[in-house]
Amino acid sequence: LGLVGSEMCIRDSIHEKLTRQITLTMPECDENCEVAYAISTAFIERIPAIQELLLKDLSANFEGDPAAYSKEEVLLSYPGMFAIFIYRIAHELYENKVAMIPRMMSEYAHSQTGIDINPGAKIGEYFFIDHGTGVVVGETTIIGDNVKLYQGATLGALSPAGMATNPNVRRHPKVGNNVVIYANSTLRGGATEIGDNVIVGGNAFLTSSVEPDTIVS
């Protein structure tokens, strides 16, 4: 009973502090903002699902790296895992329309790891970033399950003159399942779709789609 009580106290404390921080991003709210409380409640209820995703990411990072001797090593020392951990939480807040906080979280991870994952990106299960430095994943990127990115991989947007930001238009690539993108490769544009089971070799530059089961060298 004591353990259960402690867990409930921790949960309530997180709920209270998160509600307060969300309220600070909403100028129209007072200290007892019901909208902020509802968002915080929805986030707390999603924690088990976030944990499940992170455990799958941890497995992908451990099983995908022969140099890793334990999951504890990956969790405590791998920059890719750290960036993914923060992304999963920030993305949940982003999906709940929380302003500013998700981006602050992603920029903190960026400053600590050199990995820039926008919280708006949609990333599937078993996500693995190897080495990590210089990886960029843009806001409207869609990534499937079991995808591995190596250092310097960029999933970015094209920047034609006068292009305006439109949240309803995908500006970044879509990547299928079981894809490997090797070091310093760049994939750009919302029309770029990478099929399942594709390998993108190092230093590639793609602005067009790739059929499934293809090796790009």
Residue map of PLM features:
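Left-handed beta-helix
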Residues: 113, 118-119, 124-125, 130-139, ...
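Extended, small-residue-rich solenoid/repeat segments and analogous flexible loops
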Residues: 55, 59, 69-76, 80-135
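Regulatory activation segment
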Residues: 164-171
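Hydrophobic alpha-helical segments and helix pairs
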Residues: 25-83
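Short, small-residue-biased leader/transition segments that mark boundaries at the very start
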Residues: 2-9
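Amphipathic alpha-helical segments within well-ordered protein domains
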Residues: 19, 23, 90-91
